[in-house]
């Protein structure tokens, strides 16, 4: 199996999105506006609270608050519809490409001992690519655009506040996912490969059930299946534990950066650089705007498995057929057929060893 970098896998998968670029652009626009509506729900509520304390009117802000709340639902629906439309259309396209490739590789590929691995690849590996197409491409762009807008908004109160916000977004949305990817290493690929081997083993057991029963090997076979299943469960548990750890780290970072924003804002207020309104609004804005970058942080774990699945599918598509199909037939004089040093063996048993043959 060829081990590609995650970047190469991403480029290969993104190449399929070209035909749906407009829908992807629509998902990004709807997502950005939707997240801004959700963020400013909290920010406007903070503004209203300040107006109440100062005994000032806030009717226009209340209307804006209601509008943001209503729009958020429609915008979120539109974004998800676009993302999943792209995902399921592309999954159908990928399945069509995979089955076309299997027809070229048949019968040699389908007659091998890794039939279960093929089943896992055609079904669950392709399904896992849905995470990439529906929950990766547009969320990355949405997080980038929303973060830039919020850095400008928070930085409007003071440059230092904007700098702290950019540090927070960068740490949670970029550094943590990179650490997750490095920490997980080949865990995702190993899990998907072992899952394919497990599926092959189970299918072989079903196909050879009569022989297994004939030689009274049923109990041993079941124990081996249990052993492989437990190994898969342990690998999955390691991945889930890693996900939980970094999700906890992300939540802690949100709290720490929000606290740091308030402390820095209060310090600037004591220095006379900003008003106290700026302290409250900048803190509220930061706390409310972590949604897009937290989504990226959580996504990093899922992408470990998704990239592994993408790598396996790309391996299949890159495989060359062992025998080329002759479409129009072949007419001609074959002459003498010669076989030189022909060998054939299974993993543990040699059948033919350097056979030489000449047929006139």
Regions found by a protein language model. Name each.
Residues 14-21, 104-108, 124-133, 137, ...:
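An intracellular "coupling" helix at the cytosolic face of ABC transporter transmembrane type-1 domains
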Residues 1-4, 82, 88, 96-120, ...:
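Short intracellular "coupling" helices and adjacent cytoplasmic loop segments at the cytosolic face
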Residues 1-2, 317-360:
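Primarily ABC-family ATPase nucleotide-binding module
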Residues 1-37, 54-60, 79-83, 87, ...:
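Membrane-integrated ABC transporters
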Residues 213, 217, 241, 289-318:
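Cytosolic ends of transmembrane helices, especially the final helix of ABC transmembrane type-1 domains
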Residues 22-43, 47, 61, 65, ...:
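Alpha-helical segments in transporter systems
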Residues 64-76, 169-172, 243-257, 276-298:
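Hydrophobic alpha-helical segments in the permease module
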Residues 19, 23-36, 68, 135-190, ...:
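Transmembrane helices of ABC transporter permease
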């Amino acid at each position: 199996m060829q081990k590609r970098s995650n970047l190469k896998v991403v480029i290969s998968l993104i190449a399929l999105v070209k035909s749906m670029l407009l829908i992807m652009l629509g998902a990004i626009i709807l997502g950005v506006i939707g997240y801004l509506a959700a963020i400013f729900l909290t920010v406007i509520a903070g503004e209203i609270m300040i107006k109440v304390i100062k005994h000032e009117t806030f009717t226009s802000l209340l209307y804006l608050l209601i509008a943001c709340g209503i729009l958020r639902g429609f915008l979120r629906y539109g974004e998800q519809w676009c993302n999943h439309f792209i995902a399921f259309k592309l999954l159908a396209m990928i399945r069509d490409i995979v089955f076309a490739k299997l027809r070229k590789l048949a019968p040699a590929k389908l007659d091998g001992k890794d039939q279960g691995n093929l089943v896992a690849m055609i079904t669950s590996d392709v399904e896992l690519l849905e995470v990439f197409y529906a929950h990766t491409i547009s969320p990355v762009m949405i997080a980038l655009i929303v973060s830039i807008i919020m850095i400008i908004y928070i930085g409007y109160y003071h440059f230092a506040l904007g700098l702290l916000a950019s540090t927070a977004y960068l740490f949670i949305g970029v550094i943590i996912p990179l650490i997750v990817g490095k920490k997980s290493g080949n865990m995702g690929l190993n899990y998907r490969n072992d899952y394919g081997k497990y599926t092959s083993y189970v299918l072989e057991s079903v196909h050879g059930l009569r022989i297994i029963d004939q030689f009274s090997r049923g109990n041993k076979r079941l124990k081996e299946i249990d052993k492989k299943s437990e190994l898969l469960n342990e690998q999955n548990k390691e991945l889930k534990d890693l996900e939980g750890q970094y999700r906890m780290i992300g939540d802690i970072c949100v709290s720490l950066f929000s606290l740091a924003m308030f402390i820095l804002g209060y310090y600037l207020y004591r220095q006379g650089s900003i008003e106290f309104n700026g302290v409250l609004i900048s803190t509220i804005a930061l706390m409310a705007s972590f949604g897009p970058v937290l989504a990226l942080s959580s996504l990093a774990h899922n992408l470990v498995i998704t990239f592994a699945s993408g790598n396996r599918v790309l391996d299949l598509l890159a495989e060359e057929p062992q025998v080329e199909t002759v479409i129009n037939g072949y007419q001609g004089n074959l002459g003498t057929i010669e076989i030189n040093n022909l060998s054939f063996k299974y993993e543990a048993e040699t059948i033919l060893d350097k056979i030489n043959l000449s047929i006139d």
